[in-house]
C-alpha cells in the first residue's frame, strides 16, 4: 500500500500558505521521521495526511484513492501530541474506544492498559494513561499508516521506551507505515528508516 501527497498547500489566512506544494510518497513498510522547527506546520500537515483537514490545493492518495473522499474507518490514523484534544471529555473511555475500529486484547496488554480504565472519563486518567488509550485506538485492525505527532511528551522515559518497543513490534508484524514527528534526533535514529528536515517545498 502506498501513501502519497501531491502538491499539498494549506494556510489559515487567505493568500498565505504555511504548507506549500508538499510532496510525499511512502510505502506501508517504511518508517519516516520528520524534524521541523516550530511554526512550520508539522501538526497541520499530520492532520491533512490523516484526513482531518482538507488541503487548500493538492490531494492525499491511498493506493491512488483520494483519502478525503473515503467513508468509514480511515486507514491512516493519527496519534496526537495532546491526547485530550482527540477525545470527547463527556464520554467514558469504553464509549470512545467503541467509536473506532476493533482493538485486539494483545494491544491493550502491550500498552499496559488496565481494564478498569474503560469505565473512567478522560479527565479521570493521567496524561500518560490517556495517551495509551489513544495509541490503542489508532491501532485498529484496518490501520495501514500511523502518524505519531510528538506522542512521547506525556510519557516518562521508562514508559516511552516500553511504548516504542511495542509500537515498533506491532507495525513490523502488521506492515503498518509510520510517520513520526519529533524534536528528538536520538529517537529518530532508533526508529526511522528515512529522516527528513521539513522545510518549505520539501519533497519526501
Predicted regions span which residues?
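Q-loop/switch helix immediately C-terminal to the Walker
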Residues: 82, 89-103
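Conserved ABC transporter NBD signature motif
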Residues: 58-72
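Hydrophobic anchor residue at the start of the ABC signature
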Residues: 135, 147, 163
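Conserved ABC ATPase signature
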Residues: 121-125, 129
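H-loop/switch region of ABC-family ATPase nucleotide-binding domains
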Residues: 181-183
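Helix-to-loop junction immediately C-terminal to a conserved catalytic motif
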Residues: 50
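A short, flexible loop at the N-terminus of ABC-type nucleotide-binding domains that lies
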Residues: 1-5, 9-21, 28
Amino acid at each position: 500500500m502506498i501513501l502519497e501527497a501531491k502538491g499539498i498547500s494549506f494556510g489559515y489566512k487567505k493568500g498565505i500558505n504555511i504548507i506549500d506544494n508538499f510532496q510525499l510518497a511512502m510505502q506501508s513498510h517504511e518508517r519516516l521521521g520528520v524534524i521541523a522547527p516550530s511554526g512550520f506546520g508539522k501538526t497541520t500537515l499530520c492532520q491533512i495526511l490523516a484526513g482531518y483537514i482538507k488541503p487548500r490545493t493538492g490531494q492525499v492518495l491511498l493506493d491512488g484513492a483520494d483519502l478525503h473522499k473515503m467513508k468509514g474507518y480511515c486507514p491512516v490514523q493519527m496519534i496526537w501530541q495532546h491526547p485530550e484534544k482527540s477525545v470527547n471529555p463527556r464520554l467514558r473511555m469504553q464509549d470512545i474506544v467503541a467509536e473506532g475500529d476493533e482493538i485486539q486484547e494483545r494491544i491493550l496488554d502491550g500498552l499496559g492498559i488496565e481494564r478498569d480504565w474503560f469505565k473512567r472519563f478522560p479527565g479521570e486518567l493521567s496524561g500518560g494513561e490517556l495517551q495509551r488509550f489513544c495509541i490503542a485506538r489508532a491501532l485498529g485492525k484496518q490501520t495501514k499508516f500511523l502518524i505519531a505527532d510528538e506522542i512521547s511528551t506525556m510519557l516518562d522515559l521508562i514508559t516511552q521506551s516500553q511504548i516504542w518497543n511495542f509500537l515498533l513490534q506491532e507495525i513490523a508484524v502488521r506492515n503498518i507505515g509510520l510517520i513520526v514527528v519529533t524534536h528528538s534526533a536520538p529517537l529518530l535514529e532508533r526508529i526511522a528508516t528515512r529522516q527528513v528536515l521539513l522545510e518549505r517545498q520539501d519533497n519526501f
